[in-house]
Amino acid sequence: MSETSKSESLDPEVSEGLCSKTLMQSIVHELKLQMRIGLPLVVMNLLWFGKMTTTSVFLGRQGELNLAGGSLGFSFANVTGFSVLYGISAAMEPICGQAFGAKNFKLLHKTLFMAVLLLLLISVPISFLWLNVHKILTGFGQREDISFIAKKYLLYLLPELPILSFLCPLKAYLSSQGVTLPIMFTTAAATSLHIPINIVLSKARGIEGVAMAVWITDFIVVILLTGYVIVVERMKENKWKQGGWLNQSAQDWLTLIKLSGPCCLTVCLEWWCYEILVLLTGRLPNPVQAVSILIIVFNFDYLLYAVMLSLGTCVATRVSNELGANNPKGAYRAAYTTLIVGIISGCIGALVMIAFRGFWGSLYTHHDQLILNGVKKMMLIMAVIEVVNFPLMVCGEIVRGTAKPSLGMYANLSGFYLLALPLGATLAFKAKQGLQGFLIGLFVGISLCLSILLIFIARIDWEKEAGKAQILTCNTEDEQTSQGSGQDSHS
């Protein structure tokens, strides 16, 4: 046998080994890219949680009535304002991510400008809602004095709406390009000032000052991020010269609005479900104890949510970038790599929650043994929920990265509202399971959400989605034009 024939006989094995090596290298490369995007986001989200905790602490120092009214006002702001603005700004992720992958900086610029205008417009009716919060709360049976404090708190929180109308799009604009370090550093700088701002304003204006500190801190982030975008974009002349800031067509607006509806509902349906759970818990026997346990457990969940949300942003960015670059294999690899990471992270998060269940409750109370025991028990159930919660977040962001947020909306609607809440209420009230029943219902509902999204993702035609991304970013049209002109010249 000749040397040539020997080498040929080894070709299949060598080829298989090379393919395996190449696959591992590509996965490792993908993980490195996602770590670079995700780690700063984890820090940023944890800082945001710290900012909210600081606000709660300073509200508590204003007295029991101010704490109740301010907390109620902030919950109202979350449900009617923040969730809506965050949800609508999420529509930028697939457009900007795919535009960046396709190097269509004009589309990036115009989407940022349109998103800011859209959020400012949406902020107007939300503002009127906040100004009438006193009537709304008393109409639902809330105490007059608490409703009045909530109205005062929201009145001085109003500037947060236009500020978030700039902040949310700026964050989405940068993160969709994989630029997350500036977001982390600007958030860290502003958060470091949040405590001194609170000290000064809470002493001078009381609960009004605590509300003002929230939007002043976010306003600092807006100024810093705006400065960063302007300076860096001007340094990269190619990006700045493409312009597009004021060059919007009706089709551009239609695309953004079509995506913003499902994106907004996806976020709101999830946020509102947790708020409804808290309200329903207030109808259990010993409501003060039950609500306290649930809030303490959810506070630990918020810490894990910082990691969860960062994973989701990573995969949405990577999938949309690869589809925009017309690389369906890269998008597929990014999606499934992050899904595996999400499953592993969910298991780790569950173990961390179990490990801290004895310590976490003691941070809030030392004397109430019923609450301490309740926290230990409920954190075990919540740990099981985290196992499915992490991959659920990843799956939701995968479908968003493919510009199909309606899939996430249908999954959340089915899982949270057709199953989790009805089943939880049945177990809690009729089966006398109490708070445990609500969490079991939540687990079953989230599991359904995950199952639906996994089926959707398994059926994705990545080649087709890459083609759609080229149409979205107008590359297909440009290529057809250039091909047509080329054929004319040949003829």
From Swiss-Prot:
Describe the outcome of a gene knockout.
Defective in stomatal responses to Co(2). Showed more rapid leaf expansion under high CO(2) condition as compared with the wild type.
Q: Which InterPro entries match?
A: MATE_euk (IPR045069), MATE_fam (IPR002528)
CDD domains in alphabetical order: MATE_eukaryotic
Q: Which Pfam families match?
A: MatE
Query: Which chain regions cross the lipid bilayer?
Result: 39-59, 72-92, 111-131, 154-174, 181-201, 212-232, 261-281, 291-311, 336-356, 379-399, 409-429, 438-458
Q: In which tissues is it expressed?
A: Preferentially expressed in guard cells.
Q: Which GO terms describe its biological process?
A: cellular response to carbon dioxide; regulation of stomatal opening; xenobiotic detoxification by transmembrane export across the plasma membrane
* Topology in membrane: Multi-pass membrane protein
One GO cellular component term of this record is:
plasma membrane
What UniProt keywords are attached to this protein's entry?
Cell membrane, Membrane, Transmembrane, Transmembrane helix, Transport
Q: Where does the UniProt annotation locate this protein?
A: Cell membrane
Its Gene Ontology molecular function terms? Answer: antiporter activity; xenobiotic transmembrane transporter activity
- Subunit field text: Interacts with BCA4 and HT1.
Chain's role? Could function as a HCO(3)(-) -sensing component in the CO(2) signaling pathway in guard cells. Acts as an upstream repressor of HT1. Plays a role in stomatal response to CO(2).
Entry similarity comment: Belongs to the multi antimicrobial extrusion (MATE) (TC 2.A.66.1) family.
This protein's name: Protein DETOXIFICATION 56
Please tell me the species this chain comes from.
Answer: Arabidopsis thaliana (Mouse-ear cress)
